[in-house]
């Protein structure tokens, strides 16, 4: 009855293993059986354990009797008898007891080592048959040593600073894109100076004047802003000659407007209105 559950368990665990694994398990199960010589010794030690003990006990009795006889003969020594024979008998009995005891101990030790090795292999195979495809090193060492594996340590947290959330980074990028950035016009002035246009651009202001400035300054500033914006939008579309003509036309327009202002002030109509 006990063999049937084992056979069923082996049949259930069979599909878990490959053909090579099944072959190895079969060889291991066959190797669990002792060799004929060891089987005889094991049978002699298992079935005839009492006989071995009785033999050692018999040798001990012989040794004890020989020692007692040696003591007895030494107390009542008869003339003509030598003490050598009782002493020799006692020494031989004790020596035989020592040899037989040593041989029995060696046989028991070798048999115990082999039985323990086979038992360990059998236990490991039974543990593997439980369906574990991967065996950790800690589990195997703890199983072979008969100890409980230590509890796993918690994973260490990285020491790097946490990344900002995506919403915060998007908001920061939007804020940076929305803020006005000052344009550095120093390279533009240097490029004009290299083309010999520094004198023409000297009268152009890149910034608007203060609130108390005159309308003429505001016009100059507005024309300067228009030209600077035009040049910033398409600086490569104009050549140096076209840029010079454009700047000169702006200067003529400013001068003609100033002349018209002066002429209107000296006109008779203006004087007549002032006299009235």
From Swiss-Prot:
Superkingdom per UniProt: Eukaryota
GO terms (BP aspect): protein stabilization
Chain residue ranges for the region called Nuclear localization signal: 252-276
Annotated Gene Ontology cellular component terms: nucleus
One of the record's GO molecular function terms: ubiquitin protein ligase binding
Family the UniProt entry places it in: Belongs to the HAPSTR1 family.
Biological role stated in the UniProt entry: Together with HAPSTR1 plays a central regulatory role in the cellular response to molecular stressors, such as DNA damage, nutrient scarcity, and protein misfolding. Regulates these multiple stress response signaling pathways by stabilizing HAPSTR1, but also independently of HAPSTR1.
Subunit note: Homooligomer. Heterooligomer with HAPSTR1; the interaction is direct and stabilizes HAPSTR1 independently of HUWE1. Interacts with HUWE1.
Designated name of the protein: HUWE1-associated protein modifying stress responses 2
Organism in which the protein naturally occurs: Mus musculus (Mouse)
